[in-house]
Amino acid sequence: MTNDSARMRKVLTFTRRSNRMTACQKRDYQHLASRWIIPYQNTVFDYAAVFCSPAAPSAPAGAFPAPQGKTDAVAPACAPAPLVVEIGFGMGSATAAIAARNPHLSYLGIEVYRAGIGRLLRKIEAERLHNLRIIEHDALDVLRTMIAPQTLAGLHIFFPDPWPKTRHHKRRLLYRPRTDLLARALAPGGYLYAVTDWAEYARRAQEELARTPSLTWAPQGARPWRPATEFERKAQTQGRAIHELFFIKA
């Protein structure tokens, strides 16, 4: 490990926000965490075994009635589906929408904000999203220890903290050598899709990603399959432009 890499491991890329939750979010977290959250571990986890197995029931009977046309049947037997990771899903609305539209893919959302986790847990349970799981931990630790190199079909990083002050730029997620770790996790042909409303961050992130070995910029604008996030709608209401960055692993 280089000295720069060692220093980076000690710097958090996220703000420690309050874990205050509503009563509903607390209930959902208490009842559903064991069903849909994968505990953090210091070894590579077998994602195929997780996603190809049924989630053990843990919610009170009748608390989350199945939506029309869906049942609480076990997840079907399956071959390992391509795995897509989202770092920092916020309140999880876009995450759930993407997973619902792509049942042939496996999705893993990584977040430390417990209120958002509670809300996404409810969406997963209510919509029976067997192809979506959560890890509650620092995403960089997860990528270092739980995700084997060249595993991921995609990485979603939607509206990461821009850390606008110059002295805080070293905390940015899209900053080398952190981007090297992101690229390492991607399988050949996998993609990294980042979105921000901070123009200076978009420019610098594009430069950092372009300098990252094995990543190639694929500029095509917004992907039509990405739903708008709550943060994005707020940014657009305030007149801020949205910047899309899409890179492919060679």
Curated annotation (Swiss-Prot):
Lineage: Bacteria, Pseudomonadati, Spirochaetota, Spirochaetia, Spirochaetales
Binding-site list for S-adenosyl-L-methionine: 86, 111, 138, 161
PROSITE patterns reported for this sequence: SAM_MT_TRMB
GO cellular component terms listed in the entry, alphabetical order: tRNA methyltransferase complex
Active site annotation, chain numbering: 161
GO MF: tRNA (guanine(46)-N7)-methyltransferase activity
Annotated function: Catalyzes the formation of N(7)-methylguanine at position 46 (m7G46) in tRNA.
Highest taxon of the lineage: Bacteria
Alphabetical list of Pfam families matching this protein: Methyltransf_4
SUPFAM superfamilies named among the record's database cross-references: S-adenosyl-L-methionine-dependent methyltransferases (SSF53335)
Keywords, sorted A to Z: Methyltransferase, S-adenosyl-L-methionine, Transferase, tRNA processing
Similarity field: Belongs to the class I-like SAM-binding methyltransferase superfamily. TrmB family.
Name recorded for this polypeptide: tRNA (guanine-N(7)-)-methyltransferase
Residues engaged in binding substrate: 165, 197, 229-232
